[in-house]
């Protein structure tokens, strides 16, 4: 409860930021899938700290170890796939003050209120380190979707603070465009300005947020389980469960509410192959909670990192007023590292719904 | 799968727009709750069609019948509570053309693609009629939350098309303010302009959308189950499962991404009673996925109604190009009737998490 | 929680023995299944009280009404199928004393202890009346299994008190053999003695139990989800959730523990069609938690009916000693009516696992 | 799906018999439980191979490592507790023939039929080695039940082949009695004969089965969730998911069907403390699916070990007739090592239902 996600393609993550390690069990993966452990590691490398000067300087190898579920390390058995990443480079000293003073807008105070206890340092389960299990599992989901349906999932940074990339075409953008720079914005001129902004804000001891966009190209048609497990509903939950998220949009999103029905509706076009085809894609690839085969497009708002070096007002665990200045090594902006996290969560939703659709609607 | 929602306080809805009826089973409701069936009916009356001239003129009594789970019609037994509303006033003729031509941005085409079959008329499960079960169940959740924790849930229309109410204080607004006008916007001067806009757009045979805001006052502290069932994640899923939703925000939302961490963080204040208290509420009442006791504030984007009287390009079920003009009796704007739906979905999430928190964290 | 069963083919039952009605929602049924409502009613007729002089003389028509999920009353839409049976012929007076004195070995005392409240009469959810929803849903599962895989499910009474039928061949017995007599034992000579025994014990104001056997012929191969949702584990749970059950066996069962491995093992035989074939079937059609295609054979122990006319020692709800003699119209032996219940629960397990297998293992 | 068990206190196991290791994640454990890792290891030691001359001579240390969920290695955080045991002492050579010839009454053939692939050696997930995760998780459940409700769970061998212990009093038997001999039968004279029987049958290259009995003393009252998650139904599923089980009984079990209602009913006795008390315990501590506070007593049938040294008829993976004689190091009788497995599964069910009862019925 709470640390598991999905119904048929189901993952369970474990691990605190400091302790033996973090990891995940992937349950329900179809048997006889060719699985590349290198691809899993590659996704983890996109997520890991210390990958560039605009991320936290913490150095962690984040080497994944697959404990079960594979034959010869390359073919799924249909049994649970357990993956573990050992914790390294621990400096609990960094977090000493934090154990006493509650970090504003962080999870310290609420974990204490909920559980009456909490991990002594580093954010415990609320640390971004927890997302390792998600990214590793998401890498498997991606390979499943690719092999079963030719589906591609790609995310990128669309806005940092108030610097927005407006020329990206979700139909065409490639992984190499995204990975071409350290901020993961495929519009290179804008990316440069984003990096400068992150540097500047980081120098102030402050932080910033922004917006990540994600596209699913060639999704299977018919995914989504009305009325509660509509595809957009499960996507919303998936990304809103990532740390630091504040908003979710699909297709036309909040701006779409400014249009009239006649402007917003996506006219159906005749197609040669019987697939549904629409003139516009305000629906974002999902209608009535079910994928129609057009690209699925979502956007996710990430707030500025809560932990900053600037001194802030807060209280300590006795409820007394105090001040706090973060001493840990934190990202001034989480978005570059959050790109693979968003892709992973989207992949997990799609993989789960692929199997659910297969379960209910493929008998005849 | 798909028609059930919640873990411990769990609902399952059933019913097409045309057929024997629609309804819901509520499972897991605590025993010995004083339940007012009148309050359930009152919520359904806020949702029902024909309640004002800016909603669909369809007349449906939507009278709820409670089949099980109550002693003397007023106290819960702890067993499943089944509620049914019979379908009335059916005019399947209205939908005749729609069975052939797929309505743009509606669910006809995707239901057909997914299931290979669909209800012959009226939208089937994709009809807003399905939300009757949600609203009835939400009314029970509200009473549970009120009696167990003194929690209040209130939603209202914040924006219609581009007319926005900017002076509403989520801490103070009352149900009577919301119900004071037919558009359910508590700022009366703005409400008047909203009604005029809906009338004007309706006369054009077109439709419009907007934004609903919802507050939870006096939520229990500690609700939310990291890392996947964070409270905001479950809220996002809950409201994004409502028909016509395109976006979700909590607290500072998308706008919050324009702030720096030092501006966005909510400083903790010393409090007399040991409860957490923050100087600002950019977090929207949830930190680290767990409620901190401050008001929970969310916003939901609703697109313009898909079915309009204006003629539109589309295809028929054979894939041939055709045009379609909606002849049914539809809302030119769903928001006034969606207000109780949003409250219901929020109440269901809170009730479920209250029981989940009780289950895991109240033994000692 | 508690009133739902299954994962993909999932049912939720509701209703007390007295009140508005009882029923069930079936979620996840594949679309485009030809469904005969008459067949559902036929199963309910096998279950209903008053069907013969050895069952309770209560007369209830138990007429099922399908509220949703069907097109033209005969084809599934893939959406939830809700079925309701109205309660009739209520004589709450019969149960007056029982509201005060706890019936020994019945659920009165434990429901009160658990919930702190209970239905005022008739056993509430603990009544056999609750099984109506199971049998109706099971009838759908049977039709699904028949159409998808040619699977047949058949149960019968194997023992009443100490009168046992020993000549039944699970491979060959037919529904007509079972329905040939009122006790539902396909060995007619033994059946006669069983009826006499039930009559005799009933005349004493007492009751008796026995054993029901059930076979699944032509099950799909590969059903069952190790390691916890092994097919026999889910079958055990399914039938042990029926009222009055005390034991479950599969294949060789308890007697099989008296054999040595060399005697108990089922040798595999070469087969022409690639299907698995075994020389014996001590496994009862399931190996390693997975169906091997051989007939699945289980047995279920039912205790003597708890409510009897004979006076018994007990306590009242204040904890004071008292005596009680049942005045309601109860079955002296539940087994004849439990036969369709066992079939229904077995069908529900198989249908669910068929979809689960389809979901995980049919992509390529 | 399939490798997870429980709703609120939920475990997910992973790992093949050969590979990186086996383990479990325990989700939903209440925070602030004092947890002894030594006690977990002690339970694993009762389960491990090589513990006596009547078990398999494989030597495995089965040393548990706790990766997450604990503060200072002794207090639960309320977050997932991950535990891993590394695989050692692998001799895949032993299983070479088995990869080709299907072992009769083992899981080789059905895993192949279901998944189209299987672990190359040692039984994969079907190996008893998988139960390590269950026993480790069960040890946590035991500590939870003890601290929260004073509950004790104890199992023992009641019968081996046809040698039965008939003088054991479930109310009084102690762990030390069970652990006093290597066969884990608390009746020492009978135990001696059981050991001799196992030795004799083992010398023949054959195997034997038997019956394990288990008692829960001082269970919380009110556990169990009618109508499907009755406590006995979940217990049945729990133990029937263990390898080699063929039957389950509660209380009077199959023999109880030979009694009349007047003989079988458990008369309620007045009690001083308001707790329910019964004159007899044919119900086995559960009535209407809910614990009444009396000891819960169950029995489980285990078949003779499938893998034997004697030559047997079978087929190979091409469907051709062949013979097979087990060469691996296997237990001639699984029961001594299965005792802690039964206790673990029972503890997991009770812990889960304790939290579920707390969740629904403890708000007021």
UniProtKB/Swiss-Prot annotation, chains A, B, C, D:
Alphabetized InterPro entries for the sequence: Chorismate_synth, Chorismate_synth_AroC_sf, Chorismate_synthase_CS
Pfam family for this entry, one: Chorismate_synt
Record GO cellular component, one term: cytosol
Listed pathway(s): Metabolic intermediate biosynthesis; chorismate biosynthesis; chorismate from D-erythrose 4-phosphate and phosphoenolpyruvate: step 7/7
Catalysis performed (reactions): 5-O-(1-carboxyvinyl)-3-phosphoshikimate = chorismate + phosphate
EC number: 4.2.3.5
Cofactor dependence: FMNH2
Enzyme class: lyase
Cofactor notes: Reduced FMN (FMNH(2)).
MF (Gene Ontology): chorismate synthase activity; FMN binding
Keyword Transmembrane helix listed: no
Assembly behavior: Homotetramer.
Protein name per Swiss-Prot or TrEMBL: Chorismate synthase
Organism: Synechococcus sp. (strain CC9605)
Lineage of producing organism: Bacteria, Bacillati, Cyanobacteriota, Cyanophyceae, Synechococcales
């Amino acid at each position: 409860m709470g640390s598991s996600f999905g119904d048929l393609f189901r993952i369970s993550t474990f691990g605190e930021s400091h302790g033996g390690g973090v990891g995940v069990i992937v349950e329900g993966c179809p048997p006889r899938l060719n699985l590349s452990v290198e691809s899993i590691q590659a996704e983890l490398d996109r997520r890991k700290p210390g990958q560039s000067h605009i991320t936290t300087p913490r150095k962690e190898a984040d080497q994944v170890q697959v404990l079960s579920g594979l034959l010869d390390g390359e073919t799924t058995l249909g049994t649970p796939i357990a993956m573990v990443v050992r914790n390294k480079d621990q400096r609990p000293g960094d977090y000493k003050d934090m154990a006493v003073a509650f970090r504003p807008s962080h999870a310290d105070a609420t974990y204490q209120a909920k559980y009456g206890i909490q991990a002594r340092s580093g954010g415990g389960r609320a640390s971004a380190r927890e997302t390792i299990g998600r990214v590793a599992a998401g890498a498997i989901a991606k390979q499943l979707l690719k092999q079963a349906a030719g589906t591609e999932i790609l995310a990128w940074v669309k806005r940092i603070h108030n610097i927005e990339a407006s020329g990206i075409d979700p139909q065409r953008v490639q992984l190499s465009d995204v990975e071409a720079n350290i901020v993961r914005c495929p519009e290179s001129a804008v990316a440069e300005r984003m990096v400068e902004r992150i540097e500047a804000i980081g120098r102030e001891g402050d932080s910033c947020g922004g917006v990540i966009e994600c596209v699913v190209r060639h999704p299977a048609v018919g995914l989504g389980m009305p009325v509660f497990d509509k595809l957009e509903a499960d996507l919303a939950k998936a990304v809103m469960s990532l740390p630091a998220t504040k908003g979710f949009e699909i297709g036309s999103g909040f701006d779409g509410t400014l249009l009239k029905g006649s402007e917003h509706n996506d006219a159906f076009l005749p197609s040669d192959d019987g697939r549904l085809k629409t003139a516009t894609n305000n629906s974002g690839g999902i209608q009535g909670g079910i994928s129609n085969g057009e690209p699925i497009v979502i956007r996710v708002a990430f707030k500025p990192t809560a932990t900053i070096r600037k001194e802030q007002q807060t209280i300590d665990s006795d409820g007394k007023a105090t001040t706090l200045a973060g001493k840990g090594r934190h990202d001034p902006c989480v978005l570059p590292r959050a790109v693979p996290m968003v892709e992973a969560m989207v992949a997990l939703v799609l993989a789960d719904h692929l199997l659910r659709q297969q379960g209910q609607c493929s008998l005849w």
